[in-house]
Swiss-Prot record:
Top-level enzyme category: hydrolase
One GO MF term attached to the UniProt entry: RNA helicase activity
Name of protein: Pre-mRNA-processing ATP-dependent RNA helicase PRP5
Record SMART domains: DEXDc (SM00487), HELICc (SM00490)
Polar residues bias spans: 94-104
Motif DEAD box, residue range(s) on this chain: 424-427
Similarity field: Belongs to the DEAD box helicase family. DDX46/PRP5 subfamily.
Regions of compositional bias (Acidic residues) in chain numbering: 141-150
Length: 862
């Protein structure tokens, strides 16, 4: 027992000895630290005395300088000619003082408490470094003396206790060299600059508008071109006006407006065409006599006049401008290397361009001319190759023609030799908003060109616009405006809108197809619907009912669209084609004897073009329209179209009564008529122009809107960085606003005090990838100690959010557009993360721009 007691005493003694040793070591280190602190305070006091010593030395130096300037020196050597500079002295003095002060900063030790660290921080005073020598002005005598005076003044301010860097010109240089951050105002300017840069890059990336070289034909010399190729034959000379009017009335009621319009012809020989063209007309195509629109339009165009031609569908409008175009080109000298086309034909759709090319080839092969069809959705390389070889005629859509004119800086082709321009289906072209593209093409063509406009419908609203392009035009209307050809039999099937409407319409369609197949087993059937989805759905339903068919709409690739038309046009191909109104223009298929409007057209002009796909070139055809009893406006248009085409007896009494009820509603103000092709594209274009103009006025401070009497002064300053500015190009610029408070979409104990939502849905795909990839986000998260989460759902550009859904009696909003949620404990952390994300966006847009420029389009850049 005594032995155990002795052992416990020894253990206690040894432990007390070890504690004493540790305490002594701690006291020794504390004494050393106090000694070092005292020495640093002493050296600091010495440093405080230095400015007084330096000030006295500086006064002595100034006196010596003044004495030297008062007594002229004899220049003996090159060294004596140079003035004494204060720069080396100041540089050496400030560099030594800076090095001394950096040595005084003690290293932190983990054994001291927080109070010791605060005392330690007091001794480490921040000092400024001398500006970079490279940034100082050149060492001329005047500049050097001015710099010395400025530095001396700043040293005096430093001695008096004021900072000589506050208003100095060297502040930015010192901040750059020493890592001193700017004020909050500078940070805001940097953010606005980054936001402006991002906006400009996004607009540049999304702005696909091709710039064409401006041409001033008033300063150019170009050879005159012969336009008049028609001389009236003896049999048509000196005909009294009464007989001319009677002849025009007999020819489908031709109406002419304009001065000096020639008399209509009655046979091809009266045009005086070359034998090669006459052979194609009479032998290859089998056209014995011209149609009414051809009888009047051909002599007018071949007389060199500008024309507005309006005629029924299938009346031969294409041939009315093809023959004068071929005759016009044959009279001109052949193309030389680098010459562009002589004739240009613009169309609103690709299918119409292909149809016109098919008509042109019949003549170009006979007279050894070439034609190039240019439209989007197909490889551009072959089109560029054809233009490089030289082609006399271009047929295409306005967008692709501009692409080719702008390709390779305008070296692919040009329109300097173009003297004949045709706008086919001009009303639809303007209605689709092609006016800017048409103006661009016109700016590249010499002003003395001949221009021809043709269409089956031509609203008065667009007539004034069309006349602005033409010079003293002649307007020719054959068969009336927006009138169905008399060769077409029109029928309307009225469907009750109660019960399963879709099934009722399908059964009615199947019945019509079966009846027609019995009467005409080889006849083609064209079915029109309103929407692309409806076309695909109807194709599936017809296939399920053992009816072979094919579909065409704007959502199909050009290869598929071309294949579908080829399959439908082939004599042994498919009999049924389902299409949207994209096939309502220019589609000319032999044997197409039945057109079915599965969805009633929204206005009469569209109806005229749809049913005009049958009954072409004098042949007969049938048009059947399925309409619901509740579609009063559509029924009124159908009744009006049938009356205008002389089919009053074919109008059912029930249909007429519904139309009369609708007219009463219109008179009472309850309803209004459809405007048809009334220039919606022009109105939308003008609206966009007004929006852009308003934003530009806000940007440049010309007009600032006021709300509730308070001027929104920041609108002009931030216009470039606002979403509205970028939405001009179709992209919403991300917002980087920081909100104080916890984000509602997060939960749990780790929610942060500040957050920011940055929408990235509308950014280009490559830019989004650069921002949200794992490496980029992890680096930003580590650098800023924030949380960044990708949320929401991606929506295609310019698409609207779906409507809220009702589930269990509650309204559930749709998922928001794709965005990044940035969360942080401090506002500065979130602000820094936003800054880094903005930089990543700029990098991503640059990458997207480079890839877009390097897209594989062959040897040429478009």
């Amino acid at each position: 027992m005594s032995q155990l007691h002795t052992n416990s005493k020894e253990v206690h003694a040894s432990s007390s000895n070890s504690q004493d040793d540790k305490l002594q070591k701690r006291r020794a280190r504390l004494a050393a630290w106090n000694q070092k602190k005292a020495s640093s305070e002493k050296s600091e006091n010495n440093e405080d005395k230095k400015p007084k010593i330096e000030s006295s030395k500086l006064q002595e130096w100034i006196k010596r300088r003044q004495q030297k300037s008062a007594t002229p020196e004899v220049p003996s050597t090159e060294a004596s000619q140079k003035p004494t500079s204060i720069k080396p002295i100041l540089r050496a003095r400030l560099s030594t003082s800076s090095s001394k002060q950096t040595q005084l900063v003690p290293k932190k030790r983990s054994i001291f408490d927080d109070d010791d660290e605060q005392d330690d921080a007091k001794t480490a005073k921040k000092d400024f470094r001398i500006p970079n020598e490279k940034k100082l002005p050149a060492s001329t005598e005047e500049q050097e003396s001015e710099d010395e005076e400025k530095v001396l003044e700043r040293i005096r301010q430093a001695e008096s206790g004021t900072s000589f860097l506050v208003e100095s010109g060297f502040e930015q240089d010192l901040g750059a060299d020493s890592g001193i951050s700017g004020s909050e105002g500078d940070e805001e300017d940097d953010e606005e600059g980054q936001q402006r840069l991002l906006s400009e890059k996004l607009q540049k990336l999304t702005n696909k508008e091709k710039k064409l070289m401006a041409l001033d034909y008033t300063q150019m010399e170009y050879t005159s071109v012969r336009k008049k190729f028609y001389t009236p034959p003896e049999e048509l000379k000196d005909v009294p006006p009464e007989k001319v009017t009677a002849l025009r009335t007999a020819m489908d009621g031709i109406k002419v407006r304009g001065s000096d319009c020639p008399m209509p012809i009655q046979k091809w020989a009266q045009l005086g065409l070359p034998s090669s063209i006459m052979t194609v007309l009479e032998e290859k195509l089998g056209y014995d006599t011209p149609s009414p629109i051809q009888s009047q339009a051909l002599p007018a165009i071949m007389s060199g006049r500008d024309i507005i031609g309006v005629a029924n569908t299938g009346s031969g409008k294409t041939l009315a401008f093809v023959i004068p175009l071929i005759r016009h080109i044959m009279d001109q000298p052949p193309l030389k290397s680098g010459d562009g086309p002589i004739g240009v034909i613009l169309t609103p759709t690709r299918e119409l361009a292909l149809q016109i090319q098919k008509e042109l080839v019949n003549f170009t092969q006979a007279v050894e001319l070439s034609v190039c069809c240019c439209y989007g959705g197909s490889p551009i390389e072959s089109q560029i190759a054809d233009l490089k070889r030289g082609t006399e005629i271009i047929v295409g859509t306005p967008g692709r023609v501009i692409d080719l004119l702008a390709a390779n800086g305008g070296r692919v082709t040009n329109l300097r030799r173009t003297t004949f321009l045709v706008l086919d289906e001009a009303d639809r072209m303007f209605d689709m908003g092609f006016e800017p593209q048409v103006n661009k093409v016109l700016s590249q063509i010499r002003p003395d060109k001949q221009m021809v406009l043709f269409s089956a419908t031509f609203p008065k609203k667009l007539e004034s616009l069309a006349r602005s392009f033409l010079v003293d035009p002649i307007e020719i209307v054959a068969g009336g405006i927006s009138v169905v050809a008399p060769e077409i039999t029109q029928r309307v099937v009225l469907i009750d809108d109660s019960g399963d409407i879709s099934q009722k319409k399908l059964q009615a369609l199947l019945k019509i197809v079966d009846e027609f197949s019995v009467e005409d087993p080889e006849g083609k059937i064209l079915i029109f619907v309103d929407k692309q989805e409806a076309a695909d759905d109807l194709m599936v339903r017809l296939l399920n009912n053992q009816i072979s068919c094919i579909v065409i709409h704007g959502g199909k690739d050009q290869v598929d669209r071309k294949h579908a038309i080829k399959q439908f046009s082939d004599k042994n191909g498919l009999r049924v084609l389902i299409a949207t109104s994209i096939a309502a223009r220019g589609l000319d298929v032999r044997g197409l004897n039945l057109v079915i409007n599965y969805d009633a057209p929204s206005h009469m002009e569209d109806y005229v073009h749809r049913v005009g796909r049958t009954g072409r070139a004098g042949a007969t055809g049938t048009a059947v329209t399925l309409v619901l009893s509740s579609q009063e406006r559509e029924i009124r248009d159908l009744v009006r179209a049938m009356k205008m085409s002389g089919k009053v007896d074919d109008i059912p009494a029930e249909l007429q009564s519904i139309a009369d009820k609708f007219l009463k509603k219109v008179k009472s103000g309850e309803e209004k008529f459809n405007s048809g092709f009334g220039g919606k594209g022009l109105e939308n274009l003008q609206e966009r122009r007004d929006n852009v103009r308003e934003i530009e006025m806000q940007m440049y401070g010309d007009k600032v809107k006021e709300t509730n009497g308070v001027s929104n002064s920041s609108a002009g300053r931030k216009a470039l960085g606002t979403p509205e500015a970028a939405e001009i190009a179709g992209i919403k610029l991300p917002d980087f606003d920081i909100v104080e408070g916890r984000a509602p979409e997060t939960s749990g104990p780790d929610r942060c005090k500040f957050h920011s939502r940055i929408e990235i849905n509308d950014l280009p795909q490559k830019a989004r990838w650069v921002v949200v990839n794992r490496d980029s986000l992890s680096k930003i998260i580590d650098a800023t100690s924030t949380s960044i989460t990708s949320k929401g759902q991606y929506y295609p550009p310019n698409s609207k959010l779906p409507k809220p859904t009702i589930k269990y009696g509650r309204e559930i909003p749709p998922p928001p557009k794709l965005y990044l949620l940035v969360e942080g404990l401090t506002k500065s952390a979130v602000q820094e993360a936003n800054k880094l994300l903005r930089q990543k966006m700029i990098e991503g847009v640059d990458v997207a721009t480079e890839e877009d420029a390097k897209a594989p389009i062959g040897r040429y850049n478009v």
